[in-house]
Amino acid sequence: MNIRPLHDRVIVKRLEVESKSAGGIVLTGSAAEKSTRGKILAVGNGRISENGTVTPLDVKVGDVVIFNEGYGVKKEKIDGEEVLILSEADLMAVVG
């Protein structure tokens, strides 16, 4: 995948969510939840402060994160794969 996010943005591949209920019933359509976990594929250089310094991001390629799929999230298809372009502010936690 040849993509480089700018500034405080990251490229995330959504991880699959378990599609069975606790009772073993396979969930489909709207009953199946979209995962809010993903793997970081690429990271921008960092946030640019008011005085022009660049602050590196707190995440790195390979991290598994929990994200908020809000207003600023951009869905794209890159090399046939759906990825999300998020700002670091949309990331809520690093898992593990």
UniProtKB/Swiss-Prot annotation:
InterPro entries on file: Chaperonin_GroES, Chaperonin_GroES_sf, Chaprnonin_Cpn10_CS, GroES-like_sf
GO cellular component labels: cytoplasm
Coiled-coil boundaries: none
Intracellular or extracellular location(s): Cytoplasm
SUPFAM superfamilies assigned: GroES-like
Keywords assigned: Chaperone, Cytoplasm
CDD domains (alphabetical): cpn10
Swiss-Prot/TrEMBL GO biological process terms: chaperone cofactor-dependent protein refolding
GO molecular function, one term: protein-folding chaperone binding
Family listed: Belongs to the GroES chaperonin family.
Subunit structure: Heptamer of 7 subunits arranged in a ring. Interacts with the chaperonin GroEL.
PANTHER family referenced in this protein's UniProt entry, alphabetically: 10 KDA HEAT SHOCK PROTEIN, CO-CHAPERONIN GROES
Known role: Together with the chaperonin GroEL, plays an essential role in assisting protein folding. The GroEL-GroES system forms a nano-cage that allows encapsulation of the non-native substrate proteins and provides a physical environment optimized to promote and accelerate protein folding. GroES binds to the apical surface of the GroEL ring, thereby capping the opening of the GroEL channel.
Protein name: Co-chaperonin GroES
Gene source species: Shewanella frigidimarina (strain NCIMB 400)
